[in-house]
UniProtKB/Swiss-Prot annotation:
Protein name: THAP domain-containing protein 10
Region Disordered: start-end pairs: 90-136, 160-195
Species of the source: Pongo abelii (Sumatran orangutan)
Compositional bias ranges of the Basic and acidic residues kind: 99-122
InterPro entries, A to Z: THAP1/10, THAP_Znf, THAP_Znf_sf
Residue spans, zinc finger THAP-type: 1-90
Presence of the UniProt keyword Nucleotide-binding in the record: no
Domain of life: Eukaryota
Gene it is expressed from: THAP10
Gene3D superfamilies xref list: THAP domain
Length: 264
């Protein structure tokens, strides 16, 4: 039979993963252990050499530091106590379930579902007619104001066809003509096309001189100018050639005269 902890409301063994410690041989320390056990057990008269107490009843300062490190690293499963360690922690008993109340609850019928159903039935709204809310929504949509916008509309009465479920005709108001009042800047929308054009589309014609000429007249003027210049150049060249011929003839006559004088 495995050894069990002798403390009240505790029965831990080594199979529970707890370390068990035998009562010390020192008489003074053993008396303190007995007093601890007797505090919760009236039938305890004294422990013997086989009596043990588990590690749950000792404070952390009662354990050897090296044994704690070894257990945390899983090198060892058993803790060691320092000299003169005394148990001080009692285990609180778990509350036992009350059998009388459970029997009463089992014997009583389950009335929670009925109470919840009654509450839901009270809170649930009844059926609402479909004609009035629709007319109210349409009227609210036709008359609205945004910011400082004030719109007065002349409504035209339009009769709709009677619905199969509702024989009465529903009359709704549809806005046809509106007169706009002062409107806030953030709500103004201009639907008109702008009168100006983009910069990339605008075509500007710059007039040089007092009048504009087409391409044909400009080419004729250019041709007349070039022809006149050509005539001037040709006449100048002819004058130059005539002058050169005359100068050469005068030079030849001068040379002939000199030759005649030398021969004479």
């Amino acid at each position: 039979m495995p050894a069990r902890c002798v403390a009240a409301h505790c029965g831990n063994t080594t199979k529970s993963g707890k370390s068990l410690f035998r009562f010390p041989k020192d008489r003074a320390v053993r008396l303190l252990w007995d007093r601890f056990v007797r505090g919760c057990r009236a039938d305890w008269y004294g422990g013997n050499d086989r009596s043990v107490i588990c590690s749950d009843h000792f404070a952390p300062a009662c354990f050897d530091v090296s044994s704690v490190i070894q257990k945390n690293l899983r090198f060892s499963q058993r803790l060691r106590l320092v000299a003169g360690a005394v148990p001080t922690l009692h285990r609180v008993p778990a509350p036992a379930p009350k059998g009388g109340e459970e029997g009463d609850q089992a014997g009583r019928p389950d009335t929670r579902g009925e109470l919840q159903a009654a509450r839901h039935s009270e809170a649930a709204p009844g059926p609402v007619s479909c004609t009035r809310p629709r007319a109210g929504k349409q009227a609210a949509a036709s008359q609205y104001s945004v910011g400082t916008e004030e719109i007065t509309c002349e409504n035209e009465v339009v009769q709709t066809q009677p619905h199969a479920d509702n024989p009465s005709n529903t009359v709704t108001s549809v806005p046809t003509h509106c007169e706009e009042g002062p409107v806030h800047k953030s709500t103004q929308i201009s639907l008109k096309r702008p009168r100006h054009r983009s910069v990339g589309i605008q075509a500007k014609v710059k007039a040089f001189g007092k009048r504009l000429c087409n391409a044909t007249t400009q080419t004729e003027e250019l041709w007349s100018r070039t022809s006149s210049l050509f005539d001037i150049y040709s006449s100048d060249s002819e004058i130059d050639t005539d002058w050169d011929i005359k100068s050469e003839q005068s030079d030849l006559s001068y040379i002939a005269v000199q030759v005649k004088e030398e021969t004479c």
